[in-house]
């Protein structure tokens, strides 16, 4: 079984080296992939009205688009939650847990 594996490996190495030797100049190996600059149309990967947010560290918006958040808020209403009140409630709950 091992000799069969070595035979396949040797065949792959020889086939690769002979294919590379057939095209000594790297540009000749792919003549069909080149296109003339006149026929290439400019492409954009962004859909119209999508702007990428430049986010800071830790703000949670790493690369999302600006129009995703308002459109998501229309589908599912985001409740207004005061983070300070949640932190205070968590501290009170922690104190109760440590007392008992």
Swiss-Prot record:
RxLR-dEER (motif): residue ranges: 43-57
Signal sequence residues: 1-22
GO CC annotation terms, alphabetical: extracellular region; host cell
Record's keyword terms, sorted: Secreted, Signal, Virulence
Subcellular locations according to the entry: Secreted; Host cell
Motif (Calmodulin-binding motif): 78-82
Keyword rRNA-binding appears in the UniProt entry: no
Domain of life according to the entry: Eukaryota
Record note on domains: The RxLR-dEER motif acts to carry the protein into the host cell cytoplasm through binding to cell surface phosphatidylinositol-3-phosphate.
Physiological role: Secreted effector that associates with calmodulin to interfere with plant defense-associated calcium signaling in hosts.
Subunit comment: Interacts with the host calmodulin.
Family to which this protein belongs: Belongs to the RxLR effector family.
UniProt protein name: RxLR effector protein PITG_18683
Organism listed in the record: Phytophthora infestans (strain T30-4) (Potato late blight agent)
């Amino acid at each position: 079984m091992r000799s069969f594996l070595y035979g396949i490996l040797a065949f792959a190495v020889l086939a690769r080296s002979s294919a590379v030797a057939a095209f000594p100049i790297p540009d000749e190996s792919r003549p069909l992939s080149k296109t003339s600059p006149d026929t290439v149309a400019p492409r954009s990967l962004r859909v119209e009205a999508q702007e990428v947010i430049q986010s800071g560290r830790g703000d949670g918006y790493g690369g999302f688009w600006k129009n995703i958040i308002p459109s998501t808020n229309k589908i599912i209403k985001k409740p207004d939650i005061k983070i300070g009140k949640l932190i205070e409630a968590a501290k009170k709950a922690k104190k109760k847990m440590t007392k008992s």
